[in-house]
Swiss-Prot record:
Subunit structure comment from the entry: Component of the ClpX-ClpP complex. Forms a hexameric ring that, in the presence of ATP, binds to fourteen ClpP subunits assembled into a disk-like structure with a central cavity, resembling the structure of eukaryotic proteasomes.
GO molecular function: ATP binding; ATP hydrolysis activity; ATP-dependent protein folding chaperone; protein dimerization activity; unfolded protein binding; zinc ion binding
Role according to the record: ATP-dependent specificity component of the Clp protease. It directs the protease to specific substrates. Can perform chaperone functions in the absence of ClpP.
Gene3D superfamilies named among the record's database cross-references: 1.10.8.60, ClpX chaperone, C4-type zinc finger domain, P-loop containing nucleotide triphosphate hydrolases
GO biological process: cell division; proteolysis involved in protein catabolic process
Residue stretches making up the ClpX-type ZB domain: 3-56
Gene: clpX
NCBIfam families in the cross-refs: clpX, PRK05342.1
UniProt organism field: Rhodospirillum centenum (strain ATCC 51521 / SW)
Protein name (record): ATP-dependent Clp protease ATP-binding subunit ClpX
Length: 421
């Protein structure tokens, strides 16, 4: 058991599970003959959540219900309630369609691929990754900006299927039920409204190439990747049942939507606010296929993405929740990292708010939180392995704003700023 740090050891209480003393934890809860600390309670809750996740209530076809999918998304993704509901229903219907595919031959159910529209750092990639984890299917990501048409320098679209196959450990059957997330699809928009007589190999050409695998084709994939050779053997992968989720920031799309809406609503029910007075996310919710066509996506590509979910910018409160609330929250990750050095990391509420403000100013959303945390904690992470007796490191608002250094609290209860400050 851990010994008490000061005071009469006879009067010191210890957690019956981890052995930490009352001085080392925030709260110690007493039972008839045992004690449990707040850290062990939190660990127990995590274990129970993990168990619940693996035993999701499934409908008769063996697919988790939309409500259960959404509940697990809530554990990892903060906010974006509308997008989570849209995705939960779409994913449930997709895998329910696969479960019933062989049973009902009278009505053919078409596949509904998904388009995610939202600013950088709003959670598009995380949503797609979490969905694949919930359904327990292979998952891969691709960057649309690196893709080119077959025969040109760059990455062939069929390489996406190869990556999915690798994620499935070359199990073709599993790969054919996987999820593919294609990021930055807004960057492959057509360069102008009029079809060009010259080849647009990284824009419209990529959209045309993606069409084939999105609507369903048998892709010939070289097992080792790379260029195809006539002599080598290929793996045949049917993409008909692969769920494609495309995502992008679509900067400027809100102006196209706002322009379409001008003059269409009059009278007492009209929304007379200027477009910039409304949140971008609210405007994006009104997106129509014609807006995506004007943005530069070709009609066939838009037609392959019938389900559209929009995400909004994250405000201060949402970013603070992202820092602290999810199971794998950034603050929890860094606290665990410091625990490995037997040091407690304390971050004040005002400091968290300042971190959120910085991320908003940088326009990086949740994606920028880690780089901010890294820069704040760089000195403590550099110093700690060579220091003795440090019990806690405190980060306050002044530290985040660069007006002060992190505070080091030692086991003899003395405090000092970071060495070398």
């Amino acid at each position: 058991m851990t010994k008490s740090t000061g005071g009469d050891s006879k009067n010191t209480l210890y957690c019956s599970f981890c052995g930490k003393s009352q001085h080392e934890v925030r709260k110690l809860i007493a039972g008839p003959t045992v004690f449990i600390c707040d850290e062990c309670v939190e660990l127990c809750m995590d274990i129970i959540r993990e168990e619940n996740k693996t035993t999701l209530v499934k409908s008769r076809d063996g697919v988790p219900s939309p409500r259960d999918i959404c509940a697990v998304l809530d554990d990892y993704v903060i906010g974006q309630e509308h997008a989570k509901r849209v995705l939960s229903v779409a994913v449930h219907n997709h895998y329910k369609r696969l479960a019933h595919g062989a049973k009902h031959n009278d009505v053919e159910l078409a596949k509904s691929n998904i388009l995610l529209i939202g600013p950088t750092g709003s959670g598009k990639t995380l949503l797609a990754q979490t969905l694949a984890r919930i359904i327990d299917v292979p998952f891969t990501m691709a960057d649309a900006t690196t893709l080119t048409e077959a025969g040109y320098v760059g990455e062939d679209v069929e390489n996406i299927i190869l990556k999915l196959l690798q994620a499935a450990d070359y199990n073709v059957e599993r790969a054919q039920r996987g999820i593919v997330y294609i990021d930055e699809v807004d960057k492959i928009s057509r360069k102008s409204d009029n079809p060009s007589i010259t080849r647009d190999v990284s824009g419209e050409g990529v959209q045309q190439a993606l069409l084939k695998i999105m609507e369903g084709t048998v892709a010939s994939v070289p097992p080792q990747g790379g260029r195809k050779h006539p002599q080598q053997e290929f793996l045949q992968v049917d993409t008909t049942n692969i769920l494609f989720i495309c995502g992008g920031a679509f900067a400027g799309l809100e102006r196209i939507i706002a322009a379409r809406g001008k003059g269409t609503s009059i009278g007492f029910g009209a929304d007379v606010r200027a477009p910039d007075e409304r949140r971008t996310g609210d405007i994006l919710r009104e997106v129509e296929p014609e807006d995506l066509l004007k943005f530069g996506l070709i009609p066939e590509f838009v037609g392959r993405l019938p389900v559209v979910a929009t995400l909004h910018d994250l405000d201060e409160n949402a970013l603070i929740e992202i820092l602290t609330k999810p199971k794998n929250a950034l603050v929890k990750q860094y606290q665990r990292l410091f625990e490995m050095e037997d040091v407690k990391l304390g971050i004040h509420e005002e400091a968290l708010r300042s971190i959120a403000v910085k991320a908003i100013q940088r326009k990086t959303g949740a994606r920028g939180l880690r780089s901010i945390m890294e820069s704040i904690l760089l000195e403590p992470m550099f110093d700690l392995p060579g220091l003795q007796g440090v019990e806690e490191i405190v980060i306050n608002k002044e530290v985040v704003e660069g007006r002060a250094k992190p505070l080091y609290i030692y086991s003899d209860r003395r405090s000092e700023v970071a060495p070398g400050a």
